[in-house]
């Protein structure tokens, strides 16, 4: 069992979830975060920290959102681990994607933090 970052995180990346994770299971992409399901201990501490409700238990995933679980697993193997809170992405206040739009916008390229 694990928690999953879904579409609501795309182009937001608040990172408040990162500071409370006891096992450092968050990984950072260019425009979203993911959780490594092999590291997540299902503690649920991160879920209420997300101001856009992008984090959910895999047990509560809707059928149409199950691809996010696979995405989290895949990208957590190639993106860098994030342990420090950062500012949200510029313009996050205006992000209002449908789940399909978010899926199209999510970057799958390896992320290089230049800050």
What does each model-found stretch correspond to?
Residues 5, 14-38, 45-63:
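Iron-sulfur cluster-binding cysteine motifs and their immediate structural context
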Residues 1-2, 45-115:
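Flanking helices and flexible, charged tails adjoining ferredoxin-like Fe-S electron-transfer domains
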């Amino acid at each position: 069992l694990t928690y999953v970052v879904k579409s609501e995180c795309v182009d937001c990346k608040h990172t408040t979830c990162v500071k409370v994770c006891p096992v450092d299971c968050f990984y950072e992409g260019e425009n979203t975060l993911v959780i490594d399901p092999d590291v997540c201990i299902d503690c649920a501490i991160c879920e209420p920290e997300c101001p856009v409700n992008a984090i959910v238990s895999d047990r509560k995933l809707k059928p149409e959102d199950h691809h996010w679980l696979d995405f989290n697993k895949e990208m957590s193997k190639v993106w860098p681990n994030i342990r420090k809170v950062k500012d949200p992405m510029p313009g996050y206040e205006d992000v209002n994607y449908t789940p399909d739009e978010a899926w199209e916008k999510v970057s799958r390229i390896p992320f290089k933090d230049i800050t």
